[in-house]
Amino acid sequence: MEVQITNENFKTLRDGSLPLVVDFWATWCGPCRMIAPIISELANEYDGKIIVGKCDVEENEDLALEFGIRNIPTIIFFKNGDAIDKLVGAVSKAKLDEKFKAML
């Protein structure tokens, strides 16, 4: 299950006991729409093991600025409160799954 990441809930989710994957996206972004179903599938596959969130960069500009998001989609992987990896652009399910597995 995906959660909506906002300026208000990000720190709580990031600092929780489960790893966090955040997909920074926008409604007008074609590549973001391309990977959205993949992100949803992985969110379901890793439910209870990894929190998967989506952060609309237009609604949450503070977070986008904090992480220097210049291109979308950008996916940032957090573990123990720290950003440990990042992917930029539309990537394959296999590549994303590899990164998710590394989070466990």
For each feature predicted by the language model, list its residue ranges:
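Proteins that catalyze or organize thiol-disulfide redox chemistry
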Residues: M1-I51, E58-E66, R70-T74, F78-L104
